[in-house]
Amino acid sequence: MFSYLKGEAIAIHRNLQGRFFLILEVRDIGYEIQVPGRLAQELAAAIGQPQHIFVHSQQREDGTYLYGFASAAARDLFRQLISVSGIGAQGAIALLDTLTLPELVQAIVTADHRQLAKAPGIGKKTAERLALELRSKLSQWRDQFSLPDTAAQPNAAVHEDLELTLLALGYQETEIRGAIATLSQDSILLQNDNADEWIRRAITLLSQT
């Protein structure tokens, strides 16, 4: 099994299913590697330059498929995700494209099903299964790769009620994230599991901007 490939980025292309592929030339051999959309955008600006891509290979009846990542941590998290029943390679890539590594690990560890379900193809039941099967593993895994914790936030139930209420009131997701980040700096409020109090404080804060 390959650990990584080092070569020249020749091209980035997107197929009819919307999946991104990197053509990486290594010693006169062009490898076609599926990569997350975020990484594809970065690589598109670096065509013709040497690249170090961490890979996961998957053998199927119709051939060998390669999936590429910018770091060993991203590749390892991909492997953790596809170990869960019902999460295939495309679901794992969708999760990695929707959330940053720290955000994704945090969402799983804290069982934030709403955050996980933002990824295309990931429903509530799949999000619950992810948290159930991986939360203890990823708590230790995060320390191994020295991934930072995301900023402190209200618990998942409060977060969901708060976000849904503010969305219903017409606020944008960027405004909501900013308000939650600001309110989460209050250590006393963080200990409060009353969603109504969070909502009241958030509306007050947003009305001042």
Swiss-Prot record:
HAMAP family: DNA_HJ_migration_RuvA (MF_00031). GO terms for biological process: DNA recombination; DNA repair. Has three domains with a flexible linker between the domains II and III and assumes an 'L' shape. Domain III is highly mobile and contacts RuvB. Residues 154-209 are annotated as: Domain III. The lineage of its organism: Bacteria, Bacillati, Cyanobacteriota, Cyanophyceae, Oscillatoriophycideae. Residues 71-149 are annotated as: Domain II. SUPFAM superfamilies: Nucleic acid-binding proteins (SSF50249), RuvA domain 2-like (SSF47781). Transmembrane segments: none annotated. Residues 149-153 are annotated as: Flexible linker. The keyword DNA damage applies. It comes from the Bacteria. One of its GO terms (cellular component) is Holliday junction resolvase complex. Residues 1-70 are annotated as: Domain I. Keywords: Cytoplasm, DNA damage, DNA recombination, DNA repair, DNA-binding. CDD domains: UBA_RuvA_C. This is Holliday junction branch migration complex subunit RuvA. The RuvA-RuvB-RuvC complex processes Holliday junction (HJ) DNA during genetic recombination and DNA repair, while the RuvA-RuvB complex plays an important role in the rescue of blocked DNA replication forks via replication fork reversal (RFR). RuvA specifically binds to HJ cruciform DNA, conferring on it an open structure. The RuvB hexamer acts as an ATP-dependent pump, pulling dsDNA into and through the RuvAB complex. HJ branch migration allows RuvC to scan DNA until it finds its consensus sequence, where it cleaves and resolves the cruciform DNA. It is found in: Cytoplasm. Its main location: cytoplasm. Signal peptide: none annotated. GO terms for molecular function: ATP binding; four-way junction DNA binding; four-way junction helicase activity.
